[in-house]
Amino acid sequence: MSKSVHYLFDVDGTLTKPREKMDSSFTMSFLEWIVGKSVFLVSGSDMKKIKQQIPHSIISRCSGISCSMGNELWLGKELKYKNTFEPPKTLIEMLSSFQVKTKSPVLGKAPFIEYRTGMINFTTIGRDSSNEQRLAYYNWDKDHKERVRVLDQIEKTFPDLEAKLGGQISIDIQPKGRNKSQASKWVRKNLSGKIIFFGDKCTPEGNDYDIYVDVKKNGGESYSVKSPLDTLKLLERN
């Protein structure tokens, strides 16, 4: 099949369950599908976490991997670009205050703030929370909207930054415009062909929203999925 189509995939919630390894049956199906295709992974996570979730057999077949909200791009072993970000001390103090004051009944383990290339990731319950704790917090947060309130306050206080919901428990924070749409813009600028994007956090507060909109506005296709199974069903049509 021609590589005039470029497929861009979010990872958590799209190719895998949040922070889990790719399911073996999904891996087999994806390996059959990926043959002859141009595929990019676009994640809020860093490369280390992506490699923990996605098998090498798939990573090695990808045309590129965009990490940390598009702030780092790898083509094979070649680093194409890497952005930097030094968060204001007042932002770190604000996040620490949010963590101390959380009303969440679920409390996991530190770190609460994780520094990544060109961004930081924040969670009130701790990144080393178990899968059970993550799910419990996610269900609680759907009703109480803690993360939405936090990201709204961040953007009001720091107008040059943007904050987006990431995964089940966290918020991705980066300079305005340095979101996942950096990946689709790079592909469009440097490669010819149509772009098709798949992601699960495609509402305005989600970390897939900007790339979802960018692809659709520029002649591509964007799909909002609810699970890896949902993604597989769509791939059967592509």
Predicted regions and their residues:
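Glycine-rich beta-strand-to-loop/alpha-helix junction loops that act as flexible
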Residues: V11, M69, F198-K201
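Conserved acidic, metal-coordinating active-site core of Asp-based
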Residues: V106-I196, P204
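Substrate-recognition element of Asp-dependent hydrolases with the DxDx(T/V) motif
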Residues: L31-Q53, I65, F112-T124, L165-G167, ...
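Short glycine-/acidic-enriched loop or helix-start segments at secondary-structure transitions
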Residues: P18-R19, I50-Q53, G76-K77, E132, ...
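Mg2+-dependent phosphoryl-transfer enzymes with acidic/Ser/Thr/Gly-rich catalytic loops
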Residues: S2-K3, D23, Q174-N238
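Active-site phosphate-binding/coordination module
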Residues: E20-F112
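Short, hydrophobic/glycine-enriched beta-strand segments
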Residues: V5-V11, L41
